[in-house]
Design a protein with these regions (language model features):
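Hydrophobic structural segments
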Residues: 1-144
Length: 144
């Protein structure tokens, strides 16, 4: 599928990178990724999504750093972090290598997927009641 445009958005071809990791690894992984690519989306950077923690299941086999075990391990608080990168092979190789260097696992699980991602055309939404900046949420600056 190729990119396309609507009145409000452009759909751009990118790579979605997903990494499974213990929650305590996430800041280190994202710092390494952000040092190579700022993960920019319009007027924002450091754009990524982190799932809630889940349970990872695995059994170390011969050759594993922990040595072979007979029981399946169940590790809590493993999350998935996803972000988008341009389709640049050199950048992708550097990002994958950086993740491998800072991840705590012997075999980090990293998946790649071709995706189309939306990019706003920057429409004037100052009167749109559905935009957070036009509501009274706690993120609005307090008036004196």
């Amino acid at each position: 599928m190729s990119g396309f445009e609507t009145v409000s958005a452009r759909m751009e071809a990118m790579l979605q990178v997903s990494v499974q990791a213990p929650v305590e690894d996430v800041e280190r992984i994202m710092a390494a990724v952000s040092a190579l690519d700022p993960l920019i989306m319009a007027a924002y950077d450091s754009n990524a999504f982190q799932t809630a923690g889940g349970i990872e299941r695995y059994r170390p086999r011969e050759g594993a750093a922990a040595g072979a075990e007979s029981e399946v391990r169940k590790r809590p608080n493993v999350v998935q972090v996803g972000f988008h990168l341009p389709k640049d092979q050199g950048l992708l190789e550097r990002v994958i290598e950086a993740i491998f260097q800072v991840h705590s696992y012997q075999e980090p699980l990293i998946t790649l997927q071709d995706v189309l991602v939306s990019r706003s055309k920057g429409l004037d939404d100052k009167d749109n009641p559905h935009r957070w900046w036009n509501t009274t949420g706690d993120w609005k600056k307090a008036t004196a």
